[in-house]
Structures are given as C-alpha cells and as structure tokens.
Amino acid sequence: ADTIVAVELDSYPNTDIGDPNYPHIGIDIKSVRSKSTARWNMQTGKVGTVHISYNSVSKRLSAVVSYSGSSSTTVSYDVDLNNVLPEWVRVGLSATTGLYKQTNTILSWSFTSKLKTNSIADENSLHFSFHKFSQNPKDLILQGDASTDSDGNLQLTKVSSSGDPQGNSVGRALFYAPVHIWEKSAVVASFDATFTFLIKSPDREPADGITFFIANTDTTIPSGSGGRLLGLFPDAN
C-alpha cells in the first residue's frame, strides 16, 4: 500500500470511521482516521486558501484554512516525517464525491521544499507555482477524473459541461518531479504548500472533500478509495 501523509478538508462527516460530526480539517498519517482535527466553517461558493507547513526542527505539521473576511481554522500535529515517509516522494491534491457531491476546483497551487545540510552545497530546494493550469499540463500527473478546464482551473472531480458537480468521482493531480523530502545529513528539512479552492454544491450536504497529500513516488489511486476515503486509502483502518 502507499505511504500517505495528508491534510484533509473533509466536508462530509463519516462518524463511523471516526470523523467528528461536522465538516473539519484534519491531519492524516497513513490512515484516513485523522490524528488531529478542527471544526471547519466551510463556505460554499467562496474561494478559500489553505496554507500547510512543516519543519524538521519543531517536527510540527500544521495547516490553516481561511476565507477572506472571516476567521481561519488551524490544525496541527507533531510528527517526524523521516520516520513515516520515504526519502523521495511526490506531492499532490486529491478529491472525491459520493452520493452527495461538490465541485473540487483548484485555482492555484504552490509548493516549496528545502533541505539544509552542513555540506558545501548548503541547500537543496524545489519550488513550483501554478496560478493557472494549462489545458494539457506537462508538469502534472493527472489521475482518475482530474482535468484542467478552459478557465485555467484544475477540476479534481468530474463536472458537467455546465459546471455542475458529478457524484461518485475521484481524481488526483501530482507534481511531475519527485521531491527530496528528507535526508539523513540534513540539519533542517522543511516545506510549505499553499492552494486556493472553490467548493460549490447543489446538495444540502456537500461531499466528500479535498486533500493535499505526500506519498511514495509511484503512488496511484487505490481501488475502492472513493467517497469518504478521499482517493488516498484502500480502506478505513
């Protein structure tokens, strides 16, 4: 199975697998059962921003979700990613819909990782930034139903020609280049990721959610990982 670390924006509470009984953001370490969650006042039809950061000194993974003009939601969890992830990974975004649905539209996405060592070549870093997504992106690996549209947005799950969300959809987008996320001799390994998103839904209860995730480089969508498993996990263990 893939090794996954993720930050989830979970719009639909699945209390049977340990979700709190409200929309929430959470940090997932190798399981969809979040290690830490915070209540998320989700606003459909409004653009939101997610900022995720980690550094190996504090060993704290944290995420902040905000909408302009309203208060933000923060979640964090202390974890040593050296002990969880392989040295080389890919970073991606995933989303799913189920019986209930929502658009999982990504408007922009940026990422920076840095490895500081004591050697001569002091810093090894990777940076990318998408402010618009091209129609046939060469620098993204699109999986499942993910596609880019003529407006320059990334649609992680299926939408109709009129832009309405479709049910039972799963899609992911990964940056094409592997990321050197940690190294034995690194003094500090850190990363920052930011993305903006738009969730719209005709349903009273939108579903299912969007994630930012880090995984082994050959990661694929696990069979049966739709809906509440957010395109990341084969089961709810």
Swiss-Prot record:
Mn(2+) binds at residues 8, 10, 19, 24. The keyword Metal-binding applies. InterPro entries: ConA-like_dom_sf (IPR013320), Lectin_LegA_CS (IPR000985), Lectin_legB_Mn/Ca_BS (IPR019825), Legume_lectin_dom (IPR001220), Leguminous_Lectin (IPR050258). Keywords: Calcium, Hemagglutinin, Lectin, Manganese, Mannose-binding, Metal-binding. One of its GO terms (molecular function) is manganese ion binding. Pfam families: Lectin_legB. Ca(2+) binds at residues 10, 12, 14, 19, 208. It comes from the Eukaryota. A carbohydrate binds at residues 12, 14, 98-100, 227-228. Concanavalin A-like lectins of the Diocleinae subtribe undergo proteolytic processing referred to as circular permutation. The propeptide is split into an N-terminal and a C-terminal part, the gamma and beta chain, respectively. These are then religated in beta-gamma order to form the mature alpha chain. The beta and gamma chains can often be detected in cell extracts. Residues 1-118 of the mature chain, as displayed here, probably constitute the beta chain in the propeptide, residues 119-237 the gamma chain. Hemagglutinating activity is stable up to 50 degrees Celsius and is lost after incubation for 1 hour at 80 degrees Celsius. Optimum pH for hemagglutinating activity is between pH 5 and pH 7. Activity quickly decreases outside this range. Belongs to the leguminous lectin family. Homotetramer; dimer of dimers. Binds one manganese (or another transition metal) ion and one calcium ion. The metal ions are essential for the saccharide-binding and cell-agglutinating activities. D-mannose/D-glucose-binding lectin with hemagglutinating activity towards rabbit and human erythrocytes. In rats, induces dose-dependent paw edema. Has low cytotoxicity against Artemisia sp. This is Lectin.
